[in-house]
Each structure stands twice: as C-alpha cells, then as structure tokens.
Amino acid sequence: MDFINAPKSICTEVGTETHDVFDRILSSAHVEYQRNRLRLRTPDESVETSHGRVGGRKGHAAYFRIVPSKAGKVVSVRRRIKCPKMSHRAQNLEPTGEKAEHTIIDLAFSKTGCRKTITQYVGHKVHCSRCKRDYQPPAIERFRGRLFGHCFRAWAVYQRVALRLPYSAIVGVIDNLFAERVSAAGIVKFMWQIAEEYAATEALSLKKILNSPFIHADETKISICGSQQYVWVLTDGIHVIFRLTETREATLFHELISGYEGVLISDFYGGYDAATCRQQKCWPHLIRDLNEDLWKHPFHVEFERFVVALRELIVPIFDDVDRFGLKKRNLHKHIKRVDRFYKLNIEGKQIDSELVQKYQKRFQRYREELFTFLSHDGIPWNNNTAERAIRHMAIQRKISGSFYKQGAEQYLRLLGIAQSCRFQDKSFLRFLLSGEKDIDKYKERKRPRSSRRIDKANGE
C-alpha cells in the first residue's frame, strides 16, 4: 500500500539521509530560500533561520473601420514649414486650404485607474511645388494612419505578454470595457508595432548583459507551426533577452557572447562547452541527477559511497555560502577539500561500476566549471535565475501550443522586456506607458496606500 506522503522508492538509511541533504541543497537554490536565508545542516544538526496571422483569411468579407465622429478633445497642430526632402529644404511650402484630420482612440491612466479618450488632431495641408505633392502636419504624420494610441496598444500588449490572455479574450475585454471592436489580427498588429518601437530597449539590455560579471543561459523547446524549435535566454539577473533558433545548435548563442570575459552559468548541455569564457555549471542539475540515480539504485553500495563522499564535500561549502554569501575569502579555503575529494574518489580510485564511472567522468570533465564560484566573488552556484526567466515562456507554450515564427520573435522581444521589469520589481505596463526606452532609467511612481497596519496594542 502506498501513502501519499511516502516516497515511491525504497532506500537504505544512509541513502535516506543523503536524499534529505540533497533536497535541502536544491531548496536553497530557490529564490524564496535565498530571501529567507535558511542555513544548511545535516540531519543530526539543528536548522537555524538567519497567435494568429495578420489580416483575415482569403474569401472572408472585408470591413472598413468607422472612425468616431465625436471627439472628446480637439487639438490644433502646426502645419509643415519646410519640405521633408533634403534637396528641397529651401523650398517654402504653400497652404492648400485643405484640412488634415486624424482621430486617435487612446487610454488615459491615472493613479486610480484608466479611461478611454478620443482625440481629434486638426491641421492644414501644404503643397511643395518641386515635389508636386501635398504634406500633412508632422504631428499627424507621426501616427502613420493608426487609429489607436500608444497607451491603448501598450495595454493590449500587457494583457497578452504579462497576463498570457489569448487574443480572443483580449478582444472580448476591449469590447466589454471600452466598447471598441478590435480583431485578433489587430492585437497581433499591436504586438508588432510595440515590439518594433522597443527594439532599442532589447539592444540596450543585451549590451548591459554582456558587460555584467556573469551571464545565466538556458534553452527550451517551442513549437513553430508544428515544427520544434528552441528559445534561448540570456540574463544577468537584472536584464533578460530571448532568441529563437531552428535547432539546438548553439551557433547563435556563441555569436551573442563572442568576446565576453565574464563567467557563463549554464546546465550541462554540450552546446555551452565551446564558450571561450570561464564557466560555472549548475549544481542543482547535477544533484537532481545524482538523487534520481540513487532512488533507482538504492542498494548500489559503491555508488552510495561516492554520493556520501560528495555530500560530505558540498554541505560545508553551501553552508558557508548561506552564512557568508558568495565571497571568495570565505569559500577559497574549500579548494583543498575539493582536491582531496578528486584524489580519493575520482583520480585515484578505479571502480567497476558503470554508474560510478559515469559520474567520475562527468566530475573529471567539469572539474574547473563546477567550482568556479569558490575562486570569484558573487558568482552563483546555480542556474535558477535563467530557469526563472524562461518559465513564463514555458507556461505560455502550454497555453498557446504553437506559434507563428514572426509572431514568436516579436513576442520574445516583449517578453524579455517584461521579465527585465519583473527582475527589477518594476511594472511592465507602466514602463510601456512611460515612453522610456531604458528600463534602468525608468523610476516607479509611488502608489497610494490601499491598506494600513492594525495596531492591536491600541485596541484598533
């Protein structure tokens, strides 16, 4: 009989103790654990606290957008003075007597909410005798024929990227809240437009990532029109960018980090091994593999001895990480213990077990990469930051199932910006509304308090 709170596999007493220690180490890699600053101890010690295509299908009826006839605000804009062509700059433009009008539907945000606005921009057309063409006022031309303003489009993008709403749901929300009819293709167009406007933000994030002392990297599968492709993530814990490739080959990844002189933190996928910079491999990945094999082979004495020896090595190391942080002066002393572990269990010990040999080869291959964090300040020993950055993409993958390639590229750019805002505890929506292109320069506005603490001592 199996109980819900009982392990599904049996193991020895030593194995149970080792599983418990490894579970504690894996838990210590989580963000919540690092915030709470729990210390690692062995079991006998106390634990202390310290998308669709753009446009309709062929054969479907076409629709013409009806522009609102009543505007809540009318803005007069200046006419163009000089011809936009460089060779005609000296040519004065003559008024044609015709009016240029453009209506924008937008959202106005305040501290307590938002409301729909309809603004009509009115100006005069001018004519260039050399170009033989008419020109509208610059303030009207910058709208590029768009009916919806920046804040409206940014709000729709926020619903899709941050809240993961399907296009059909966003269409319904817009209809119910703002009484505006927008098609799913219209939402896709919003995504394209906003992604294009914030291309500079992504480029700036990549530049800052490459200037950081360490980079977290990871990859995951994605379905593009039913074909399996891969999404790559790069992050320094503050900025995030994504890239899409057709295969798992790391060519594009190596091009991105070409010339990087910091430390690359990754899992054990072979594509990362060709990086020319220093590397730190993810310990939780290795510990999970050891834990899984220990469950599968509970009575494998030689493997159990190997795992126990490793446990005795890493527990004091991670205990010092929790106590002192990732400081070289406190961790460098463990290098001698690492050398002793390799001498006794890797280099000077021949074991017939294929399972143990597999891990011996793995430890030998990644000897330097496993312990880089002991010799440098501030280098994380896990890759959970990259996994945290890419998890949003994994959830969206379950919801959407498949993406179109071009739509996926725009989505990933916006997701990188959203995750960068999240890592900096900033609102993705309010960043888009601000018009700022540098996430680091954007400052969150203080929000009004919605609650206050109850003082029980005063009887409140």
Regions found by a protein language model. Name each.
Residues 127, 158-166, 226-240, 283-286, ...:
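Short conserved beta-strand segments at catalytic cores or DNA/RNA-binding microdomains
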Residues 268-269, 273-309:
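Conserved beta-strand -> loop -> alpha-helix junction used to position metal-binding or nucleic-acid-contacting
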Residues 168-179:
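DNA-recognition alpha helix
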Residues 3, 31-34, 46, 53-59, ...:
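RNase H-like nuclease fold core
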Residues 149-163, 322:
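Short, amphipathic alpha-helical "recognition" segments used to contact nucleic acids or chromatin
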